[in-house]
Structures are given as structure tokens and as C-alpha cells.
Amino acid sequence: MSSESSKKRKPKVIRSDGAPAEGKRNRSDTEQEGKYYSEEAEVDLRDPGRDYELYKYTCQELQRLMAEIQDLKSRGGKDVAIEIEERRIQSCVHFMTLKKLNRLAHIRLKKGRDQTHEAKQKVDAYHLQLQNLLYEVMHLQKEITKCLEFKSKHEEIDLVSLEEFYKEAPPDISKAEVTMGDPHQQTLARLDWELEQRKRLAEKYRECLSNKEKILKEIEVKKEYLSSLQPRLNSIMQASLPVQEYLFMPFDQAHKQYETARHLPPPLYVLFVQATAYGQACDKTLSVAIEGSVDEAKALFKPPEDSQDDESDSDAEEEQTTKRRRPTLGVQLDDKRKEMLKRHPLSVMLDLKCKDDSVLHLTFYYLMNLNIMTVKAKVTTAMELITPISAGDLLSPDSVLSCLYPGDHGKKTPNPANQYQFDKVGILTLSDYVLELGHPYLWVQKLGGLHFPKEQPQQTVIADHSLSASHMETTMKLLKTRVQSRLALHKQFASLEHGIVPVTSDCQYLFPAKVVSRLVKWVTVAHEDYMELHFTKDIVDAGLAGDTNLYYMALIERGTAKLQAAVVLNPGYSSIPPVFQLCLNWKGEKTNSNDDNIRAMEGEVNVCYKELCGPWPSHQLLTNQLQRLCVLLDVYLETESHDDSVEGPKEFPQEKMCLRLFRGPSRMKPFKYNHPQGFFSHR
């Protein structure tokens, strides 16, 4: 490469007028080529620094000569041409020097590139050798790791300890004088002893198998004998069915129930056993039954069968699944929610009969993954009831059992561990699913023997029979009381919507014979509307207006006076009395905030409610309170002082007998009715 490039770079000769041209023309080409090639050798001998100084000196001389030529040309004269020619010759010599320096610089550049290329090739060769060596090192390290990780099969055998080996092994195997000092021989001896022991155990195993076969044959013979007895026993049971029905002793049906109960989950099983025992011992009207698919319940406890066909076809199934579209995240969450909220196939039904032939149907479910129980309720009556508009929520499955115990509204899960499970599948609260799954009341968990301590949450809760038995009787009585109370309210609301306040004969003595004020309106009120009423602020601030309560509005009129009564009916009625808030529209608007007598009227029905309870179980409390409000409105209007400036008779003449019309600076009216005297007095 260097020779070819040097041939192309032939130096050009600049001729001057003063130099002899003929001599230069006669030089041979070989001499010129020799001079050209000598420059490559000259590069190694010359100092680049000195060439650089020569280059600067030559450039300065050229500048000087050019300046002198310019100066001579500007002056003019006869001798100027000769001087200019001399300087021109000197300039040509300097140009030749510059061209030579330029050629030397190019030759140095080429040599530098060639040296760099050779050094780069050496570096690449060394780098390749390094990569090969690193690969060899990595390969050797892998082989070393495999050697270190190698485990012999005898290492997986659990050999007896050394003490036991030397104690039990015979001398011809243990060879203590040889094996004590040689670990290798010691291991071989222990393996020989292990082999000897396994041979003995294998012989013993064969003997046991032969004994097992003999016992199995005996069992088969006995099974054949017992199976021959089964048809006879069935015929005897069928023949005894009429006797069982006649004596009201359904042993066959009970036996089937007990067989089905074996497949119940522990909480439902505890409920079934305790409810059946309570019904037999204390309440004959309680009937217990099991519903659902027994086959599905059996399938839950059946272990999965391992088949070789499934393993052989796994590759084909995997290939098919890869071609299917992967379900979206929303579909996966829905499937996880359904799996988490899955109920057990079997459920327990309790039918609780009341005095008026009404029946409370309770269906108990068990949520397997959440480990809680739920219940759905339904009330049926002997005669079809005409449901008033205001009684729509009294017997609804969503509210009929609400707050059977104080604060137990059944909208939250009683198991603290469920909240962590809900977070994984995106469930905010269980209240969104209670209509489908049922309500997880606390008393339902206790009937199933489940108790979830909040202070120290337990990972697994076991059903406890004693817990269920301790709450069974109290809960059944509360359920009966709740149904009877709701049915009584149902009948009363039918009369109230027609403007009739039903007062039983047992409670007539609580009121005067003549009551002029009358009920004209009885409607249900939404919880939000009740919260917005201006005269119910005290109840709302006191925290008595919960969303589990029922709200109603009563309107009582007499003449131009209209009394509004906002009623809060607790689910625990009648053990918890209703709360009334009053607003009288007559000569302005009067509430407990601006009229002490209105506050006193509220106290008569809210505080002194025990006087109005009537005979147990106090189902007439609400109607007696409404009737008392009518009487109180009569007293309020009749005892109001007459304005002398208004002509004509008094709008509400006094018909009630009062010992004293007013008392104290607040002019309180006599609202207490005294029986049997029939007059009103102050408290």
C-alpha cells in the first residue's frame, strides 16, 4: 500500500527562468523514483520538530520576499527587474521546500495510521483471547458447581445414628476396629446394615399382607351376610310406617334428616342439633329441616382423583389454552368475588309458629370462604293480610329481623378477617350483597356456635355447641315477640291510614270518654326527609335517628289547629318505645323550642310512656300514644285563654274538667289524666 501510494505522489518540478531547464529534462525517471522513495526513509531520520521550525522559517521568508517584490514593483526602475527575478528564484526554492515538507507530513500521517491500525488489530486479537479465556473460566466454574452440588443416592437415605448402629448391628457388619477410623468404610457398613434391616422389614411386610388378605376375606363374608339382612330390614321399616304416622313418631323421616345432617358444615350442624334439641325439649311448634343438594355437599369433601391421562394430555390442553383469549381483569375479579361469596349447597330451615298461626320461616346459609352464617326471613299468616301503604317495611325480609339485639343491623360482616379478603377482590362492604346472600346478624353466628373476638382476631373459629345452646332460647323468644309485634303494627296501621286510632277495651280507662281531636293522616316518611324537618333537630342531635329505624308522620286536627307528630319507630318496638316530636300550627307555629307546653306534651308520650303500655306484651303502645296526643291537643286548645278583643264565642270551649288551668310562670297546662275521677291535673 505504501509503495503504490508513493508512486502516485510524484513530485512536480517548478522551473524558473534563470535555472537551466535542459539539465532537468535530461534526468532519468529512475533517478526521480529513487529520490521519491528515499523520502520515506528520510522521514524516520528527520525530526518532526525541526521540520516544523523549518516550515515556520520558510513561511516567514516567503512573506518577506513577497513584501520586497511588492515594494520593488511599486518603486519601478531599470535594475528592479533583476532584483525581482532573484527574489522570485529564492521564492521558488522556498516553495520547493514547503512541498517537500508537505510530502513528509503526509508520509508521517500514513505511517501513523498504519501503526494505529496494526495496534488496533493486536488489541482486537488480545480482546478475543480474553473473551475465550473468560468463557473457559465460566465453563469451568459451572462444572465445579455441578461437582459441588452432586449428591449421591446414599445421602438421601436416613441412616440410623452411630450409637444405635454400633449397638444393634452384628460385629460382622459393624467391624468396629476398621470402621471407627475410616469414614468411608463406616458409611459402607451402615449401608449394609440398612440393607439388612430393609430385607427383614420386607419379609415382615409380606407376612402382614397375607394376614390382611385373610381378614379382608372374612370381612367380605360378613358383608354378604349383612347385605342379605338389608332387604328384610327395609320391609320391616315399610311395614312400620303406618304405626309411626299413627303414633306421631316419624323415625324414618328423622333418620333421613340425621343422615343428611352428616354433610352439613360445622356451624350449620351445630344449629341443626341445638335447634332440634330445643324444639323437642321446649317448643314443639319449632320445626327444623335441611334443604339443598346432598350430592353437591358430598362433592365438596371428595378428594380430587389423580389420573395419568390428565398428565399425558397436559401438553395438548396447554396448547389449547394459549390459543384462547385471556379473560379481562374485570371478569377475573367477578369470578373471584363469586367464589369468595359462595354458599354451602345445604341450608337449615327453621319454621317458628306463633299464637295467631303465623309462621316465621328462617333459612340459614353458610359462606364457606368467609366462615360466617347468614339468614333470610319470611313471614306467612293464616289469612292473607291487606298490606297498608305505611306497613310496607314492617314484614319485609330486609328489616323484619333488624336489630333483634341492640345494634345488630346485619349489614356488616362479623368476622374481622373478611375485610382483608374483600380488599383482594375489590369488595367495599358486604351490605351490597345481603339481599342475595342474607344478613350476617351476630345472633345468627352465635346460634351456629361462632364467636369472633374483635380484640384478638383468631385465624380459625371453631363452632361451639355451648355458645349456641346458651343463646337458643332467648333468641327464639325474641323472634316470636318480633313477629307478633310486627303483625300487631300491621293491623294497627290499616286503621290509622283510615283515620281511626284503635284502642282496645283493656286500655279505654286511660282516656276520657270524649275525645274531639282526630287523626286525619298517617304516612311513612323517608329517613332523609325526617332529618330535614326543622322540629326534629333534637332527636337527630341525640343520635336517635338511625337509618335502621322506621319513620312516620301523623297529622291530628281539631278545627283550625293542626298538630304534626314525627314518629321514630325503633325495630325493637314495643320493648323500645316510639319517640314523638311535635309541631302545632295554630296562631303561628309552635314547637318545643318556643312553647313549653309543646315540650310537656312530648314528655307525656315519650317520658310517661309506661302508663300507656297496657297489658303485656304492650303491642298497643303506639296507638295509645296517638290517642294520648289527641287528648293532649284537646286540653291544650280548651285551656287556652280567650282573647277579649275578639267578638263571638270561644273557638274551643272547655269540655275537660281541670283542677287548675295554669301553673307557674311558664303557665303550664294540666296534661295528666286521673282515672277514674276523670279530671286533668299537673304533674
Swiss-Prot record:
Keyword RNA-binding: yes
Name by which UniProt lists this protein: THO complex subunit 5
Crosslinked positions (Glycyl lysine isopeptide (Lys-Gly) (interchain with G-Cter in SUMO2)): K153
Protein purpose: Component of the THO subcomplex of the TREX complex which is thought to couple mRNA transcription, processing and nuclear export, and which specifically associates with spliced mRNA and not with unspliced pre-mRNA. Plays a key structural role in the oligomerization of the THO-DDX39B complex.
Key words of the record: Acetylation, Coiled coil, Cytoplasm, Differentiation, Isopeptide bond, mRNA processing, mRNA splicing, mRNA transport, Nucleus, Phosphoprotein, RNA-binding, Transport, Ubl conjugation
Family the UniProt entry places it in: Belongs to the THOC5 family.
A Pfam family it matches: FmiP_Thoc5
Compositional bias per record (Basic and acidic residues), positions renumbered to this chain: 22-42
Gene Ontology BP terms: monocyte differentiation; mRNA export from nucleus; mRNA processing; primitive hemopoiesis; RNA splicing
Tissue specificity as recorded in UniProt: Ubiquitously expressed.
Keyword Nucleus appears in the UniProt entry: yes
Post-translational modifications reported in the UniProt record: Phosphorylated on tyrosine upon binding to activated CSF1R; which causes a dissociation of the two proteins. Phosphorylation on Ser-5 and/or Ser-6 is required for nuclear export. Phosphorylated on Thr-328 in insulin-stimulated adipocytes. Phosphorylation at Tyr-225 modulates mRNA binding.
Modified residues (Phosphoserine): S5, S6, S307, S312, S314
InterPro entries, A to Z: THO_Thoc5 (IPR019163)
Record localization: Nucleus; Cytoplasm
Positions of post-translational Phosphothreonine modification: T328
Annotated region (Disordered), positions in chain: 1-42, 301-336
Lineage: Eukaryota, Metazoa, Chordata, Craniata, Vertebrata
Region ranges (Tandem RWD domains): 247-683
MF-aspect GO terms: mRNA binding
Biased composition (Acidic residues): 306-319
N-acetylserine PTM sites in chain numbering: S2
Motif annotated as Nuclear localization signal, chain positions: 7-10
Chain spans, region Interaction with THOC7: 2-199
